[in-house]
Amino acid sequence: MKLDFKHLTQFKDIIELDKRPVKLDERETFNVSWGIDENYQVGAAISIASILENNKQNKFTFHIIADYLDKEYIELLSQLATKYQTVIKLYLIDSEPLKALPQSNIWPVSIYYRLLSFDYFSARLDSLLYLDADIVCKGSLNELIALEFKDEYGAVVIDVDAMQSKSAERLCNEDFNGSYFNSGVMYINLREWLKQRLTEKFFDLLSDESIIKKLKYPDQDILNLMFLHHAKILPRKYNCIYTIKSEFEEKNSEYYTRFINDDTVFIHYTGITKPWHDWANYASADYFRNIYNISPWRNIPYKKAVKKHEHKEKYKHLLYQKKFLDGVFTAIKYNVMKG
């Protein structure tokens, strides 16, 4: 399997929402990108809003690579850009050629959009911050903006402890035990990305059957294989991973404070339940919801459960929240969907 990745970055459409009173070249701003499908539209939007709300003195250019864009979403993003006098660029991509790559219900084809952003922008920019769309900013990016690269491929945050030994064993390299990173936050040295032809290397590795059989998190595992011994390590505050299902698992309303604190810059809401779901009624989700409530999305209801795995998790949250009738109804619906 040999993919023509240059063809993949021939976007079907590029839409620029530039509401700045004074225009700047992209290289004079801090560039941040997301890669999304329809399910993560609101996540990327609130991620942008959270950065702007917490970094009002900085100049940004925001880039969203998406396989679906509708008029309402574009209009709401335009309102967001107007509110903060910023620029948001939208890139519509055809996802069909990427569907030959490893994916699953949990890991959709959109996970590969970050690779396309690295490849596309490597010819245009020196650096790029990539964020997953389930990440919210709650602090200053000044230290990150001031970071300088030498020959590192980028700057990353080590994944949680539970991922380390398992990843080293899976990837057959003990060096990953203590250095395996989470790809949700990646500050990429695009000069080095271009020089080392890393997009091509990524797809070469993804075409290797001996590599494919080791993969559990397709793009993240490949990026780790490439970045081993070639990355700056950022402190945990830039990728504070929190899973909202911990609320009913731990049954402790303060549990999230072990992960999210005053130093936290980025909160990464991993797992099935996201803070934009209508059952995520917890203090841990307020960092997202507080921004949501001052955004153009504020009058739009939170997302309902649609997929089977969402219903499975939703009913457990509802029962924990003592919403017994709704919880039982959702559990029944899940069992019907399960068959």
Swiss-Prot record:
It catalyses: UDP-glucose + [lipopolysaccharide] = UDP + D-glucosyl-[lipopolysaccharide]. Mg(2+) binds at D132, D134, H268. UDP binds at residues 35-40, 132-133, 268-274. The keyword Electron transport does not apply. A motif (DXD 1) lies at residues 132-134. A motif (DXD 2) lies at residues 219-221. The keyword tRNA-binding does not apply. One of its GO terms (molecular function) is lipopolysaccharide 3-alpha-galactosyltransferase activity. It holds the Pfam family Glyco_transf_8C. Pathway: Bacterial outer membrane biogenesis; LPS core biosynthesis. It is an enzyme of class 2 (transferase). InterPro entries: Glyco_trans_8, Glyco_transf_8N, Glycosyltrans_8_dom-fam, Nucleotide-diphossugar_trans. Its cofactor is Mg(2+). Disruption phenotype: Mutant lacks two hexose residues from the outer core oligosaccharide: the glucose residue added by WaaJ and an additional residue attached to it by WaaD. The side-chain GlcNAc is also missing. CDD domains: GT8_A4GalT_like (cd04194). It is found in: Cell inner membrane. GO terms for biological process: lipopolysaccharide core region biosynthetic process. Keywords: Cell inner membrane, Cell membrane, Glycosyltransferase, Lipopolysaccharide biosynthesis, Magnesium, Membrane, Metal-binding, Transferase. Its EC number is 2.4.1.58. One of its GO terms (cellular component) is plasma membrane. The C-terminal domain is important for catalytic activity and membrane association. Belongs to the glycosyltransferase 8 family. Strain F653 represents the enterobacterial R3 oligosaccharide core type. Glucosyltransferase involved in the biosynthesis of the core oligosaccharide region of lipopolysaccharide (LPS). Catalyzes the addition of a glucose (glucose II) to the outer-core galactose I. Has a marked preference for its specific donor substrate, but it appears to have a relaxed specificity for alternate LPS acceptor residues, providing the overall size of the acceptor is conserved. This is Lipopolysaccharide 1,2-glucosyltransferase. It comes from Escherichia coli. The lineage of its organism: Bacteria, Pseudomonadati, Pseudomonadota, Gammaproteobacteria, Enterobacterales. The gene is waaJ.
